[in-house]
């Protein structure tokens, strides 16, 4: 694929992301940016190490069983590969390679294209998670036992197709407004869809708690509770990454403005930094709410510090009373509220039922 100089003006603002090194040297800001580049390279290696650590722990704890986990890993890997493309961009730029900032160089184009293809699915991750939960609600009868792996393939095929088409069009379109609009619109729809899914499952939950069970089986009630818990998790995840979901596309939108090359260079560096922090914060939030992951990570940390790990999962520290022992377990209901035990009342109720059963 060949390029000529006349194409530069057409594609100049559409690359992921173009940094004009020559202009930066002329204005005297390159040394400052070079320092930032080295920090970004260090962050990329942290992202790569963090990814390998997460995959290792997931393999040890068998975290590939649910559709949600499969979708997470299928989107997580391309994002990491996108940062590998970013690493190559930085190295070529620092080494004064023609492929580092020469838009007429085919290598520069393909690195930018592959980086976009790998990174764009990250902007659609919330939509993918919510879509899977709607399928879980629709197939309420047996979703716990039959998760229908083909659903993962369908969701990922749609996500990857949109990302691929967006990346190709991004490098030829005269404006990035439509791409940014799609990114933000899908994120907003994901928030709304998650809330509607929560309301629907909450109504199912209240029906299932009737004295007659509402006609729901035990498996259905479990799935309803699981959907509600996921809605709360989604809210925490969405709030944690909302800044990145909005600021990243906004940086792409700024490229359409008629601003100086100096500001565009700054915008490029800010965009790269946002994506790097996004790649660290998102998996951290996801894994922070995973008990199996936290337990295994603690074991690894303890082994590094040569501290013996206690394997008794249900160990209860000595308490002044039995009530404190029960309450120290911090058992929560479906909606995340802590259940407080009144041991005396619970014991009396238990023996009354037992006495009636023996009578």
UniProtKB/Swiss-Prot annotation:
A Gene Ontology biological process term: sensory perception of chemical stimulus
Cellular component, GO annotation: membrane
Chief location: membrane
One Pfam entry name: Sre
Membrane-traversing stretches: 33-53, 74-94, 111-131, 150-170, 180-200, 237-257, 266-286
Subcellular location: Membrane
Keywords from the named record: Membrane, Transmembrane, Transmembrane helix
InterPro entries xref list: 7TM_GPCR_serpentine_rcpt_Sre, Serpentine_rcpt_epsilon
Topology in the lipid bilayer: Multi-pass membrane protein
Family: Belongs to the nematode receptor-like protein sre family.
Protein name as annotated: Serpentine receptor class epsilon-13
Species of origin: Caenorhabditis elegans
Gene: sre-13
């Amino acid at each position: 694929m060949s390029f000529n100089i006349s194409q530069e003006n057409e594609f100049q603002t559409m690359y992921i992301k173009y940094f004009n090194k020559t202009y930066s040297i002329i204005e005297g800001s390159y040394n400052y940016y070079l320092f930032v580049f080295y920090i970004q390279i260090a962050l990329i290696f942290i992202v790569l190490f963090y990814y390998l650590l997460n995959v290792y722990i997931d393999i040890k704890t068998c975290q590939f069983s649910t559709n949600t986990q499969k979708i997470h890993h299928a989107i997580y890997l391309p994002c990491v590969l996108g940062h590998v493309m970013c690493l190559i961009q930085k190295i070529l730029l620092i080494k004064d390679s023609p492929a580092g900032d020469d838009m007429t160089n085919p290598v520069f184009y393909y690195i930018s294209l592959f980086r976009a293809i790998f990174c764009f699915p990250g902007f659609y991750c919330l939509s993918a998670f919510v879509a899977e939960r709607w399928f879980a609600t629709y197939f309420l009868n047996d979703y716990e036992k039959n998760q229908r792996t083909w659903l993962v393939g369908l969701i990922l095929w749609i996500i990857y197709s949109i990302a691929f088409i967006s990346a190709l069009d991004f490098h030829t379109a005269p404006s990035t407004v439509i791409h940014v609009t799609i990114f933000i619109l899908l994120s907003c729809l994901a928030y709304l869809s998650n809330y509607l899914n929560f309301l629907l499952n909450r109504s199912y939950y209240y029906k299932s708690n009737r004295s007659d069970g509402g006609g729901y089986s035990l498996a259905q009630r479990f799935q309803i509770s699981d959907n509600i818990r996921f809605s709360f998790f989604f809210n925490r995840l969405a709030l944690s990454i909302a800044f990145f979901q909005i600021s990243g596309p906004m940086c792409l939108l700024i490229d359409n403005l008629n601003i100086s090359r100096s500001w565009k260079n700054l915008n490029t560096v800010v965009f790269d930094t946002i994506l790097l922090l996004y790649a660290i914060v998102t998996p951290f939030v996801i894994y922070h709410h995973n008990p199996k992951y936290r337990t295994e990570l603690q074991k690894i940390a303890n082994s590094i510090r040569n501290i013996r790990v206690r394997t008794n999962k249900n160990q209860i520290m000595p308490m002044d009373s039995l009530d404190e022992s029960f309450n120290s377990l911090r058992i929560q209901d479906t909606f995340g509220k802590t259940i407080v035990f009144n041991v005396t009342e619970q014991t009396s109720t238990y023996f009354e039922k037992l006495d009636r059963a023996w009578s």
